[in-house]
Amino acid sequence: MNDSLLISIFTKGGFFIYPILVCSIIALSIFLKKFFLISKDKIISKNFITQINLNIDSKNFDKALALCESDKTIFSSLVEIILLNRDKDALFIESTLEDEGQKNIYKLSESNEILGSLSNICTLLGLLGTISGMITVFKVISTQTVVDPPSLAGGISEALYTTAFGLLVAIPTYVGYKYLNSKILNISVELQDESKKIINRIKN
């Protein structure tokens, strides 16, 4: 998008361009925050898994617990629960993990729905801009016996620019929303799989 087009959008797009711009800034900040939050190293560290497995195999549970406290990832908090309840049956451990896992996934998903809502809001704001522009056009038509085409340009520009800008923000926002949801679902599955491996390792 070149500078002249960007200037045209903000000078001719009308009032509704600005709420869409605010939505785009909010959406981008939420996406970037979530993107870095769910980076794999902050959820499951492969090095941590290797070290934990070595300590479990050697029955060095105190050192394994110390590793959990120092790792500070979601997975390490789940492993800590497993280790603290290692003398209990596997079903009890899995039930406890499920509750804790749901809390962690909820925290990861928090504010994701805002992205989906912002996508819809931008589309609707674009539509409002279209309606506002067309109202301007009809006002001009109703006040002139002979319509001068250039006098309609302002309303038409407002309608087209607002619609285009609304979609320009809404589409990537929705893609980001779906991407984050997909990543969080994959993380949830991986956390379950890795947790079961740790339980089996302790019980066998």
Regions found by a protein language model. Give the residues of each.
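Hydrophobic alpha-helical transmembrane segments of polytopic membrane proteins
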Residues: 158-175
